[in-house]
Amino acid sequence: MAPRDSAEPLPPLSPQAWAWSGKFLAMGALAGFSVLSLLTYGYLCWGQDLEEEGSLKAQVDERPEAGTAGTSQPHLIFILADDQGFRDVGYHGSEIKTPTLDKLAAEGVKLENYYVQPICTPSRSQFITGKYQIHTGLQHSIIRPTQPNCLPLDNATLPQKLKEVGYSTHMVGKWHLGFYRKDCMPTKRGFDTFFGSLLGSGDYYTHYKCDSPGVCGYDLYENDNAAWDYDNGIYSTQMYTQRVQQILATHDPTKPLFLYVAYQAVHSPLQAPGRYFEHYRSIININRRRYAAMLSCLDEAIHNVTLALKRYGFYNNSIIIYSSDNGGQPTAGGSNWPLRGSKGTYWEGGIRAVGFVHSPLLKNKGTVCKELVHITDWYPTLISLAEGQIDEDIQLDGYDIWETISEGLRSPRVDILHNIDPIYTKAKNGSWAAGYGIWNTAIQSAIRVQHWKLLTGNPGYSDWVPPQAFSNLGPNRWHNERITLSTGKSIWLFNITADPYERVDLSSRYPGIVKKLLRRLSQFNKTAVPVRYPPKDPRSNPRLNGGVWGPWYKEENKKKKSNKTKAKKMQKKKSKARMRKQLAAHSSIKCHPSVATG
């Protein structure tokens, strides 16, 4: 499905600029490549030890797959990791061991030009609606636990569309798309079953979350009710995997299945079972060590999900998609090296994600896709694979990219609106003048058109954070890799193809390109809906809801309130009518001539 309008073609970077950028990149990134090569060697050595020790034990028996005849529609398995950094996978050179992810990706299609959003709610909303944030009103930040806000109810969700063509739809894991009303819950947005958390984070064992002092509650749900039976200290990654196995064990593989598994890992708080620390004692940075253990547990979980797909007869007709929801957070153990920036920013480190597709149904297995892909593309792609229909009047921002992935064809996508956030205007020096009268550069925005990427406003923390496993590089950053944003700057231009690490700002060199991208931003902004970011509601406090985070907005209260309002209006009308009668009565009395009237 095409976006609302097409982008203007932009000229390529000149050969001289390519050469100039290449020299700059070579000097700045050489050390990074040597580090990556060392880590790759260490990972390969560890992989041999892993096979010998058998430390990743399956929780289900590996046995030949049963027949799966009976449906031409594939089973769709979407696995979403939380806060996994771009570098935090073995095949990107990480020191963290991810043999399952490496194997699945190597046998499938690696997505090496794949983009998501910089934080949780936006990525999840775009996956489930196929629309940019500016078209759902979720442009600003995330949905907070105490906000009366959720994914707009007038947006048809992916599971709703899949149910129309006969799919059973199940969600396991983190929702984070709002819950203040019952209509906002996953089971009301297209999922037959839901087992997971409603908030953005929480304790992995107790499943409790405090949003602020005194505002704490339990956050684990079975469909529409608190899952108190699981208040027993089970680590969420393992608990969610067990639920996935149960779903697969009880579902008929001849009937199409959509399974959305949104793991809590590797989001903070940094917690993991003790045995996963075994191979990471040498990592000095404690947050990195804990993060590594969490990621190893996640890798094992996906291993067990894959085995269950095979055991219960789903695998041969399944399409498995793996994605992170945003970049890693270096202060919480994640790494996006050698990309610039982190989670919460519009630099490449915040929005370029780990992603791959694994399936026996792929035509080009064992390949790398470098075509432009965005998280909104999964919506039309999966509906098309499911033999579903998208209404012509629904304007999506995603494209069907299955042929791009499976057959290696060119991507239909030429641009990505990373976001326009009119509320976030922290760039003190931004102005209309800086945007050539086309755009107010105080506004945080980012757009990609072909090779070019433009950022305005304050894009967020902009450092390159090196691998934290190496203590000699310093506790926080490698000083040679740090660049401080220029004072007064509110606009940047990069050629991402030539300069994927965003080291060479070309905004002053190519003002014509800047103007074209600013016009494109302006075009997108004309289609934006108002931002939905309401103030917190004190009724959301779990203490008022049995100690549980959950829907607090009661429809019956609304009716009572409306009835009271009507009664008050009637009283006012009666009162006004009485006053009018009294005034009329007084006006009919004639004044005595000797009585002064003025």
Swiss-Prot record:
Q: Which residues carry this modification: 3-oxoalanine (Cys)?
A: 120
Q: Which InterPro entries match?
A: Alkaline_phosphatase_core_sf (IPR017850), ARSB (IPR047115), Sulfatase_CS (IPR024607), Sulfatase_N (IPR000917)
Q: Belongs to which family? A: Belongs to the sulfatase family.
Keywords of the record, alphabetical order, are: Calcium, Glycoprotein, Hydrolase, Metal-binding, Secreted, Signal
Protein name, please? Arylsulfatase J
Specify the signal sequence span: 1-47
User: Mind telling me which PANTHER family this protein's record contains?
Assistant: ARYLSULFATASE (PTHR10342), ARYLSULFATASE J (PTHR10342:SF69)
UniProt-annotated stretches for the region Disordered: 532-598
Q: Which domain of life is it from?
A: Eukaryota
Q: Which sites are catalytic?
A: 120, 176
What EC designation does it have?
3.1.6.-
Molecular functions per Gene Ontology = metal ion binding; sulfuric ester hydrolase activity
Q: Glycosylation positions?
A: 155, 304, 316, 429, 495, 525, 563
PTM summary from the entry reads:
The conversion to 3-oxoalanine (also known as C-formylglycine, FGly), of a serine or cysteine residue in prokaryotes and of a cysteine residue in eukaryotes, is critical for catalytic activity.
* Keyword Repressor among UniProt keywords: no
Report the locations given in the UniProt record. Secreted
Acyltransferase as UniProt keyword: no
Co-factor binding comment? Binds 1 Ca(2+) ion per subunit.
- Which CDD domains does this UniProt record tie to the protein? 4-S
State the needed cofactors, names only: Ca(2+)
Residues bound to Ca(2+) are 82-83, 120, 325-326
- Start-end of Basic residues biased regions: 559-583
Q: Which residues bind substrate?
A: 174, 267, 343
